[in-house]
Amino acid sequence: MFSEIQTIPDAAAEIKGSPEFPKIRGMVYFFGVHNGTIVAADIRNLPDGNAFHGFHIHEGTCQGTKAEPFAQADGHYNPTNAMHPQHAGDMPSLLANDGNAFLIFYTDRFHPEDVIGRAVIIHAHSDDMTTQPSGNSGAMIACGEIREMKTE
C-alpha cells in the first residue's frame, strides 16, 4: 500500500486554524486504494503540546462567522446513518507531540470521491468514542475543505 502514497493523492484538504488558533496548519491527503482510502495527515502547531484531538470528516464546509468559525461544517459524514463511532467520517484521533501530529491509516468507509467538498475538522479534545452523536471532542479548532487533486 505504500506505493499508493508515493503518487499524487486523489484529494486533499489544507488545514487552517480558527481565529483562536491561527497557527494551526497542515495537510490531509486521500489516496484511493483497493476498496477504500488511505488517509495521511500532517498537522503542525496544535495546542496543548502533547494531547489527543478529535479528527473527523464533516458533512458541510469550513464556512462560518467570527463567533462560530466553522458553523457550516454540520455533523459527521454519515451516509449510512450509523451510530458514533461508526460514522464514515469518524477517523482516529490525532496524537500531538510537541504540537505536531502525523497519522496514516486505511479505511473502507469511503472513497476519496465521496468526501470531496466536505470538511476535515480537528477538535480541541479527544473523541471519547462513546458520547452520541459525536464523541464529546470539544470545539472545532481547525478545518480544511477536501478538494479534488487535478492531474494533467
Regions inferred by a protein language model and the residue ranges of each:
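N-terminal leader/targeting pre-sequences
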Residues: 1-152
